[in-house]
Swiss-Prot record:
Transmembrane segments: none annotated. PANTHER family: GLYCINE--TRNA LIGASE, CHLOROPLASTIC_MITOCHONDRIAL 2, GLYCYL-TRNA SYNTHETASE. It catalyses: tRNA(Gly) + glycine + ATP = glycyl-tRNA(Gly) + AMP + diphosphate. It is found in: Cytoplasm. Keywords: Aminoacyl-tRNA synthetase, ATP-binding, Cytoplasm, Ligase, Nucleotide-binding, Protein biosynthesis. Belongs to the class-II aminoacyl-tRNA synthetase family. Its EC number is 6.1.1.14. The keyword Cell inner membrane does not apply. This is Glycine--tRNA ligase beta subunit. InterPro entries: DALR_anticod-bd (IPR008909), Gly-tRNA-synth_bsu (IPR015944), Gly-tRNA-synth_heterodimer (IPR006194).
Amino acid sequence: MSTKNLLLELFVEELPPKALKKIGEAFAQTLQASLQTQGLLSADSVLTAFASPRRLGVHLTKVLEQADDKTVMQKLMPAAVGIGADGKATPALLKKLAALGADESAVAGLKRESDGKAEVLFFNSVVTGVMLTDGLQKALEETLGKLPIPKVMAYQLADGWETVNFVRPAHGLVALYGADVLNISVLGLHAGNTTHGHRFEAGIDPVYIRDADSYAKQIATEGAVIASFAERRAEIVRQLASAAAEAGSNLTPIEDEALLDEVTGLVERPNVLIGQFEEAFLEVPQECLILTMKANQKYFPLLDSKGGLSNKFLIVSNIRPADASTVIGGNERVVRPRLADAKFFFDQDRKKTLMSRVAGLDKVVYHNKLGTQGERIARVRAIAQAIAGKLGVDAQQADTAAQLAKADLLTDMVGEFPELQGIMGRYYALHDGLPAAVADAIEDHYKPRFAGDELPRNPVGMVVALADKLETLVGLFSIGQVPTGDKDPFALRRHALGIIRMLIEGKLDIGINDLITAAEKPFNGLSAEHRSALLNFIFDRLANALREQGYSAQEIDAVLALQPQRLADVAERLAAVRAFAALPEAASLAAANKRVGNILKKVEGTVAAQVDTALLKEPAEIALNQTLTTVKPQAEAAFARGDYTASLQALAALRNPVDAFFDGVMVNAEDIALRNNRQGLLATLHQAMNQVADISKLAA
């Protein structure tokens, strides 16, 4: 069947810029998927998506005018129900066939097949392929219903009666199959071949689209619009680089993918211009200036070769006037008060020391069940003191940093820009004459804030960051505020991962149980249930992180089953398990370890790992004990020096003695003394085999 190319455009009022990329991709991909499902696209059909502030569009090549007919085999009923004893169709079968548009003449062509229970009648029917107009109508309605729209608007159509719900009011619909207009409608609009270009700079309005393939070129030349989100974004990147080079040889625009996407969603005809502000504003911390330019004005600040902020910035305008000075001047006038506000906040904040603000935290509620920020800081200080003592970090500096960590929450700058919490605390601490290690720790105690974020830059920061995150975890677990499903309002998963990363990447010599013990003391302890839940939560987060790094489920289960306390060793344990699993003895020893564990579980009480050699009677148990006497010290010595691979590989010598033991020795002997001694031998074996990891997890 012949094909043509398809063009669809929905013309709307300005779409949310932050959501435009996602909405545009969803619009194109969902529409394509629906048409594909209906059989209206060729196998090699190519999709081109369009998304600009005022339009969502799709271009598809090789679209069928009608889908191919399909033969569908439909299950009817058991043959015993459909065919009577006389061999003729029963009324029930005839009624079913009539519903499918067939009569008694179709009975002879019915197929009989078993469905595993009985012989069943099947009817082959031909389903006529859907027409493009009908299929596109269905696809468009489905697509609009599935868009990831942040908020929906309700508006009335021109008739004043009908109400429509969509992200923004829609004003036009183009649907072209080749040069033919398709008869579809949606959101109270009927498809045509006219659209509108740039709000201010279109050369022709309306723009009459000749055919599906001319859309992109016509909307660009006649409508002054780059309709493709990707092309418009690339053009902005090109212009930013060009303008930065023009502004100064060593200047580069700040890299911010989210800002770039948002600006791409704001303009249809990008034009990058250079603006500047007074150098006096550079006395303000550059993070403040950068944030106000990006968040409030959507500008791209220019940085020098050392990463320092210059007094120039780039504006992505939506118009291209012959004389851009008015546009530039207007933007410079707008940004100046913003920068002046930032300077005012900075100057005012420095009139009070951070220490003088600490008392004010007693009036800031942290959680109605956990008290104020002041009470929270007291807990963080106590936890930080305990951790600093165990890690040999300057306890006084850790205490000061913990005490001042949240003080900047009461400053004007952080009140205006919450994203600067910690950052401003560092600047104000340095202004107050505090040591750099303390100032850095105040900023860094929030780190790592997200996947890939850097860790605190010094030991004091590491201690306070651990204390802050542990206080949050222990406090919220103590009142039952744990993450459920996708809901994690207090970012506890992120806090747990932050702790894990600091322990592993920082190679901190402290156990996870020691940390929880230190953190629970200011809360007067955790219940056994809450402590166990928190420990499992942390190890679950670690398991997820390790899976993302490519470790197998068996390897992870083997190591984490023991809940190793020093997380800095986890990578070495995993490497040792992987090397052990490659040994020819591994499978047999893993199975044996599993068997030993099952035997010991059935014994009432705890089995002591000790052996009375005088009670060893069978040659196999004597041989196993002798081998254990040699192997166990070797494995323990390697474990003690951190050579986990050698520790596990030493176990290989146990394979034959263990196999012989299970082949020739009755563990549960009738003689109680023999039975207890053999159980003690197995407990000793189990102890030796489960120092680095629970190798039974490697059993098939």
